[in-house]
């Protein structure tokens, strides 16, 4: 017993007594440390929550994803770690998409400016693989699957006090798939390439965002936005368009029209390929796709409904905030990390009305105006619940809308006018930001 040991030590001379006492103290400390370690390692006990920054800023996304998954196995209620994993997974999915586009030699073509997938600043690949139609569809499906993974991770988050500080601009992605993410593959460089901005590395280091639960819902909503786009590309068969126009966006494509792969040499910085306008006209003409997977159209409708639901929930969370801490999407009483941008009460009120109006349209309870007859309107929801082959020219002309025309309740123009008045000339930018 401890009393016996102390009595034994006390019978010794002073020098030996101190030596024995030190041995006893050290032995007790070691025993305590072993016991504490054993308890900490037992399943269900708290551990130190990992942070995503060390993995995001070094480009070690796969390692980070494994660390977070292992941690969450025994700490699944840690919403901060869950949010961190969701961010890592979103960045991993973006990285995989860019690597796929690089592998097939994507070309930076202004014609692809309206297609989000083709706006990514993918480096030029000196030895690209040949892209087939099925190969491109696999790229789109991989992106859809990655977004679904992020959604599954983010959905359980409930902590209203959640806070995750990140320097987004310093995140590194391995664009070209060479196994390392260098300085040229940082997000602030990508932002400059996509937007034409002049952000410096110093700016990126100072751009610290404190993401909260409202932002977690915001990101979850964006996985639905991007997922809907991917589902549309998979719902229709666009092989004919691919064969005639894929060369506009990729260096080597599997096409029966081999002459399309012969590219005139650029003579100067003002070079203009006279065949590009002809190819674009052809692209419009061939934007006529058979419907091959109609169930994906229903999925698109569900994605859009989820965007509305999550935006409502996000704004409920944002409006409940009382702090003002490096906000990504602020309420009217907070300051945003985005310079010289303020959110007003009028903006929020008009946005929430807009969400209600869009929800009615997606439920088929309100229609959108028909541009060729003001007495008729289009049941927008039916386009997805009763899908048909897609024909761009026929939609512009109006005949493609015929199966969906009704004398129904049309959307309230006042809601849309309020939006324009509240947001002004920056309406589109705010819509993209607010989600």
Annotate each predicted stretch with a short phrase.
Residues 48-50, 55-66, 90-418, 428:
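Short coil/linker segments at helix-helix boundaries
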Residues 78-79:
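Residue-level recognition of tetratricopeptide repeat
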Residues 24-37:
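Bacterial N-terminal signal peptides
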Residues 83-84:
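Alpha-solenoid helical repeat scaffolds
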Residues 38-40, 46:
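Boundary at the C-terminal end of the N-terminal hydrophobic targeting segment
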Residues 1-21:
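N-terminal secretory signal peptides that target proteins for export/translocation
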């Amino acid at each position: 017993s401890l009393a016996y040991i102390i009595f034994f030590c006390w019978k010794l001379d002073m020098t030996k007594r101190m030596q024995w006492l030190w041995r006893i103290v050290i032995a007790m400390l070691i025993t305590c440390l072993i016991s504490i370690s054993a308890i900490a390692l037992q399943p269900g006990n708290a551990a130190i929550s990992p942070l995503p920054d060390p993995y995001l800023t070094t480009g070690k996304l796969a390692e980070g994803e494994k660390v977070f998954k292992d941690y969450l196995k025994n700490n699944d209620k840690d919403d901060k770690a869950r949010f961190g994993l969701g961010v890592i997974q979103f960045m991993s999915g973006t990285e995989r998409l860019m690597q796929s586009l690089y592998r097939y030699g994507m070309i930076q073509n202004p014609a692809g400016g309206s297609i989000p997938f083709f706006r990514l600043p993918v480096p030029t690949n000196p030895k690209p693989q040949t892209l087939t139609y099925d190969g491109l569809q696999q790229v789109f499906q991989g992106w859809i699957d990655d977004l679904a993974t992020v959604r599954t991770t983010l959905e359980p988050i409930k902590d209203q006090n959640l806070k995750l500080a990140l320097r987004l601009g310093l995140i590194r992605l391995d664009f070209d798939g060479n196994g390392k993410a260098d300085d040229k593959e940082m997000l602030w460089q990508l932002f400059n390439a996509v937007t034409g901005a002049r952000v410096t590395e110093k700016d990126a280091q100072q751009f610290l965002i404190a993401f909260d639960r409202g932002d977690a819902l915001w990101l979850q909503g964006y996985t639905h936005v991007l997922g809907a786009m991917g589902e549309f590309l998979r719902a229709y068969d666009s092989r004919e368009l691919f064969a005639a126009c894929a060369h506009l966006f990729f260096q080597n494509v599997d096409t029966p029209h081999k002459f399309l792969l012969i590219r005139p040499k650029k003579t100067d910085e003002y070079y203009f390929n006279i065949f590009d306008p002809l190819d674009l006209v052809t692209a419009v003409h061939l934007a006529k796709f058979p419907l091959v997977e109609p169930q994906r159209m229903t999925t698109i409708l569900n994605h859009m409904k989820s965007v509305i639901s999550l935006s409502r929930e996000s704004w409920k969370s944002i409006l409940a905030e009382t702090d003002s801490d490096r906000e990504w999407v602020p309420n009217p009483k907070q300051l945003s990390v985005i310079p010289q941008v303020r959110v007003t009460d009028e903006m929020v009120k008009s946005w929430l009305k807009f969400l209600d109006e869009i929800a009615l349209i997606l439920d088929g309870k309100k229609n959108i105006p028909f541009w060729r007859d003001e007495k008729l309107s289009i049941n927008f929801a039916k386009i997805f619940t009763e899908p048909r082959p897609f024909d761009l020219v026929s939609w512009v002309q109006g005949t493609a809308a015929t199966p969906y025309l009704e004398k129904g309740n049309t959307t309230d123009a006042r809601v849309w006018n309020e939006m324009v008045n509240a947001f002004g000339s920056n309406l589109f930018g705010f819509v993209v930001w607010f989600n």
